[in-house]
Amino acid sequence: IFMEKITDRTPSEALNDNLKGLYMGMDIFKRYEKKCKSNDLKNLLNDVINLYSKEACELSSKISALGDSPASNVGILGKASEAIYNIKTVTADTDSEILEESIKAFKTGIIMFQKFLHEKEDQLDEESIDLVKNMIQENEKLSKKLNEYSSPHQANFF
């Protein structure tokens, strides 16, 4: 009811929505990183946090260049979504559960960027398109690392 389609938003509003999503992702992955025990998994989750932080800076700069104010937090709707993820964070106790939830959350972020690009590409300047495409590529590379890490640990998921 409260969610607008991405197509109903201006390009900078939609970029801001993605920025809020990055803030939410950083919060979620910071919680996961604190809970996990494996140093390798902590390092991998820290890579996600660092990537999201870098992308948040890039999006903020682009939104400012478009003449709008970048979001500085997840916003009201983001808080509601964050509450749902908080429940999942609380229930994910083992490293394998944390990894499984991390992969799901990370894939959701990639899907949101792909959806944004699909619905907004004809309204974006070339620089914005390149920025989002690069973000998708960087996220897909890190997604491969998460999946590669999960392969030897997958037996713990079932």
Question: Where are the regions a protein language model picked out?
Answer:
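Secondary-structure edge/capping motif, primarily at the C-terminal ends of alpha-helices
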Residues: 32-36, 66, 87, 91, ...
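Alpha-helical scaffold segments that form or flank carboxylate-/histidine-based iron centers
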Residues: 10-18, 39-58, 95-102, 125-138
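Amphipathic alpha-helices that form helix-helix packing interfaces
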Residues: 18, 25, 32, 55, ...
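Preference for long, well-ordered alpha-helical segments
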Residues: 105-158
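Alpha-helical bundle segments that constitute or directly flank the non-heme di-iron/ferroxidase center
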Residues: 4-36, 97-122
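Carboxylate-rich helix-loop segments that flank metal/cofactor sites and access channels
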Residues: 57, 61-97, 104-111
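Charge-rich, acidic-biased intrinsically disordered regions
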Residues: 5, 43, 50, 70-87, ...
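Conserved alpha-helical segments that form or flank metal/cofactor-binding pockets of metalloenzymes
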Residues: 40-77, 146-150
